[in-house]
């Protein structure tokens, strides 16, 4: 391998604003397959670390792939430091994780990374399941989130079902959901964005609730009837981009929600089952 060595000047290394750790598909627009282009549209540099590599989501008649082996996963993370590509790192985001062991490996990497990046923003989307499907990850993942990732995160973006799993509390009404979110806050975890709080069914509205120690903001947006997948991944990509571009949290959440609605409508207009990002000229 040494005879192949061409690039050893670390001063020339590409630098990332964000490391995004989540699923990747060959076909489709979920996980990093939608998050990376969305983040890049915002003018930010992102490195994608896959947790699973799949042919497509399981919602098609064929489906191939699986979780990245731990040795590879830890190597992907380690290589970013070996390439000296994290000097300007500002945020790490997590989405769908393949195994509990990946969560532990990631937490160990983040803990070490924090020593050189004390202001690093860690945003965790604790992908566990939803009300309609129940838990759709391996059964040991919720406890791994609680034990390893939540203590490191500054912000998390659970849906109502995931908030219930993480807290053990019923969250089916707004007050209960807010109380559950507040129970997770700590010196490290500064905010919880509940991405699917109950809304006004008659007015076809959904609510996103932004909870911090000193404020609660409820944001209502239109409910779009759709089977599109990856909207949560897109929302998180837009949210972290907005935060890094200087938006206040509630404003960043509001803008991210509007962008997701725009992308969904654009996708429907183009009669696609996979999210399509509008070109910048149309964004």
From Swiss-Prot:
Keywords: ATP-binding, Kinase, Magnesium, Metal-binding, Nucleotide-binding, Transferase, Zinc. GO terms for molecular function: ATP binding; hydroxymethylpyrimidine kinase activity; magnesium ion binding; pyridoxal kinase activity; zinc ion binding. Substrate binds at residues 23, 59, 233. This is Pyridoxine/pyridoxal/pyridoxamine kinase. InterPro entries: PdxK, PM/HMP-P_kinase-1, PyrdxlKinase, Ribokinase-like. GO terms for biological process: pyridoxal 5'-phosphate salvage. Pathway: Cofactor metabolism; pyridoxal 5'-phosphate salvage; pyridoxal 5'-phosphate from pyridoxal: step 1/1; Cofactor metabolism; pyridoxal 5'-phosphate salvage; pyridoxine 5'-phosphate from pyridoxine: step 1/1; Cofactor metabolism; pyridoxal 5'-phosphate salvage; pyridoxamine 5'-phosphate from pyridoxamine: step 1/1. It comes from Escherichia coli O7:K1 (strain IAI39 / ExPEC). Mg(2+) binds at residues 136, 162. Pfam families: Phos_pyr_kin. Its EC number is 2.7.1.35. GO terms for cellular component: cytosol. Homodimer.
């Amino acid at each position: 391998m040494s005879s192949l060595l061409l690039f050893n000047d670390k001063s020339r290394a590409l630098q990332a604003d964000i490391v995004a750790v989540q699923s990747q598909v060959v076909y489709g627009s979920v996980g990093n397959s939608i998050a990376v282009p969305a983040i890049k549209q915002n003018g930010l540099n992102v490195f994608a670390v896959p947790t699973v590599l799949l042919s497509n989501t399981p919602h098609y008649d064929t489906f191939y792939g699986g979780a990245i082996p731990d040795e590879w996963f830890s190597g992907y993370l380690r290589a970013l430091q070996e390439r000296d590509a994290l000097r300007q790192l500002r945020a790490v985001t997590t989405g769908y994780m393949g195994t509990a062991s990946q969560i532990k490996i990631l937490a160990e990497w983040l803990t070490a990374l924090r020593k050189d990046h004390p202001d690093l923003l860690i945003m965790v989307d604790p992908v566990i399941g939803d009300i309609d499907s129940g838990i759709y990850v391996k059964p040991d993942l919720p406890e791994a989130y609680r034990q390893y990732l939540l203590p490191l995160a500054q912000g998390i973006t659970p849906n109502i079902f995931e908030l219930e799993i993480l807290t053990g509390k019923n969250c089916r009404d707004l007050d209960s959901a807010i109380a559950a979110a507040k129970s997770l806050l700590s010196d490290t975890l500064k905010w919880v964005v509940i991405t699917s709080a109950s809304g006004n069914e008659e007015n076809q509205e959904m609510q996103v609730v932004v909870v911090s120690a000193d404020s609660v903001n409820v944001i209502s947006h239109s409910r779009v009837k759709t089977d599109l997948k990856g909207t949560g991944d897109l929302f998180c990509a837009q949210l972290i981009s907005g935060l890094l571009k200087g938006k206040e949290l509630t404003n960043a959440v509001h803008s991210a929600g509007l962008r997701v609605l725009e992308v969904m409508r654009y996708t429907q207009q183009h009669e696609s089952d996979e999210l399509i990002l509008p070109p910048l000229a149309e964004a």
